[in-house]
């Protein structure tokens, strides 16, 4: 798969990116290079190879979840300008 110059310009337009002809040509080359790499990767025969989640088979040592602070909701809401029913009230910014 490869992109034409017109397709690159259309994608830039849809993304609301202003792009010159030189930049579009450079971007076309970069994107087509990425697509070629993807095609090469898809051409590799991976039958019989088990998918892996990580490059190295290492497990993490995890600690137990423990509460490190108590409930401080009342202290935080005591300094809030406005609260109602336990919720913070903020000014309306979208009409």
From Swiss-Prot:
An MF annotation (GO) of this entry: asparaginyl-tRNA synthase (glutamine-hydrolyzing) activity
Keyword Protein biosynthesis attached: yes
Alphabetized UniProt keyword annotations: ATP-binding, Ligase, Nucleotide-binding, Protein biosynthesis
Intrachain disulfide bonds: none
Catalytic activity field: L-glutamyl-tRNA(Gln) + L-glutamine + ATP + H2O = L-glutaminyl-tRNA(Gln) + L-glutamate + ADP + phosphate + H(+); L-aspartyl-tRNA(Asn) + L-glutamine + ATP + H2O = L-asparaginyl-tRNA(Asn) + L-glutamate + ADP + phosphate + 2 H(+)
Domain of life: Bacteria
EC number: 6.3.5.-
GO biological process terms on file: glutaminyl-tRNAGln biosynthesis via transamidation; regulation of translational fidelity; translation
Pfam annotation, one family: GatC
Job description of the protein: Allows the formation of correctly charged Asn-tRNA(Asn) or Gln-tRNA(Gln) through the transamidation of misacylated Asp-tRNA(Asn) or Glu-tRNA(Gln) in organisms which lack either or both of asparaginyl-tRNA or glutaminyl-tRNA synthetases. The reaction takes place in the presence of glutamine and ATP through an activated phospho-Asp-tRNA(Asn) or phospho-Glu-tRNA(Gln).
Family: Belongs to the GatC family.
Assembly and binders: Heterotrimer of A, B and C subunits.
Protein name (record): Aspartyl/glutamyl-tRNA(Asn/Gln) amidotransferase subunit C
Organism, scientific name: Dechloromonas aromatica (strain RCB)
Lineage: Bacteria, Pseudomonadati, Pseudomonadota, Betaproteobacteria, Rhodocyclales
């Amino acid at each position: 798969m490869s992109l034409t110059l017109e397709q690159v310009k259309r994608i830039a337009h849809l993304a609301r990116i202003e792009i010159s002809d030189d930049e579009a040509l450079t971007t076309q080359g970069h994107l087509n290079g990425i697509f070629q790499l993807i095609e090469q990767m898809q051409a590799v025969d991976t039958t019989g190879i088990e998918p892996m989640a990580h490059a190295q088979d290492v497990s993490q040592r995890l600690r137990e979840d423990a509460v490190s602070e108590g409930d401080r909701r009342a202290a935080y809401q005591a300094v809030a300008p406005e609260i109602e029913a336990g919720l913070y009230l903020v000014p309306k910014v979208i009409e």
